[in-house]
UniProtKB/Swiss-Prot annotation:
It comes from Chlamydia trachomatis serovar D (strain ATCC VR-885 / DSM 19411 / UW-3/Cx). GO terms for cellular component: cytoplasm. GO terms for molecular function: adenyl-nucleotide exchange factor activity; protein homodimerization activity; protein-folding chaperone binding; unfolded protein binding. Participates actively in the response to hyperosmotic and heat shock by preventing the aggregation of stress-denatured proteins, in association with DnaK and GrpE. It is the nucleotide exchange factor for DnaK and may function as a thermosensor. Unfolded proteins bind initially to DnaJ; upon interaction with the DnaJ-bound protein, DnaK hydrolyzes its bound ATP, resulting in the formation of a stable complex. GrpE releases ADP from DnaK; ATP binding to DnaK triggers the release of the substrate protein, thus completing the reaction cycle. The gene is grpE. This is Protein GrpE.
């Protein structure tokens, strides 16, 4: 005797997916894969942007480090250059032989100044200007009523900058109005 299966043809049809169900499943899988692909693409683009930003940041840092290194090296040359300028200022008051030597030193000084210029270092003058703490260091204050307060009366050391950024501020003497108590007592003495 042979056994017949207990399943009917209706049951077989329900266990097999219908074409509509299969289409829905495939569409859902397709949508999931598209979403996953978009997510992976977004991650890739973010990683690419981060890498580009890192590259730019490192390049900027490298450029700044080089600029600061150049500035520091140039700053070391400022005192000897200024000493040479002062010495050359006295050369005109000496013998012909010293004057001839001074011409050679003047040429050397010009070469230094040319290097500074090529590197963007600019000397700025301060006398007669208004005091700016970003560009000046007040090392002396003189009370006066004839010159507006904050005006620079004398420059002890020159200031130098690259672009708008000072690499060495000028050391200066600044005018200040006398305190009211001081001006009254000065008038009484006269």
């Amino acid at each position: 005797m042979t056994e017949t299966p207990n399943t009917s043809s209706e049951e077989i049809q329900t266990s097999e997916p219908s074409p509509d169900n299969e289409l829905q499943v495939l569409q859902q899988e397709n949508a999931n894969l598209k979403a996953e692909l978009q997510e992976q693409n977004d991650r890739y683009l973010m990683a690419l942007a981060e890498a580009e930003n890192s590259r730019k940041r490192l390049q900027k840092e490298r450029t700044e480090m080089m600029q600061y290194a150049v500035e520091n090296a140039l700053m070391d040359f400022l005192p000897p250059i200024e000493s040479m300028e002062k010495a050359l200022g006295f050369a005109s008051q000496t013998s012909e032989e010293v004057k001839n030597w001074a011409i050679g030193f003047q040429m050397i000084l010009q070469q230094f100044k040319q290097i500074f210029e090529e590197k963007g270092v600019v000397e700025y003058s301060s006398k007669g200007e208004l005091f700016n703490p970003y560009l000046h260091e007040a090392v002396e204050i003189e009370e006066t009523t004839t010159i507006p307060e904050g005006t620079i009366l004398e420059e002890f050391t020159k200031g130098y900058k690259i672009g708008d950024r000072p690499i060495r501020v000028a050391k200066v003497k600044v005018a200040k109005l006398p305190a009211k108590g001081n001006s009254d007592s000065n008038e009484e003495k006269e």
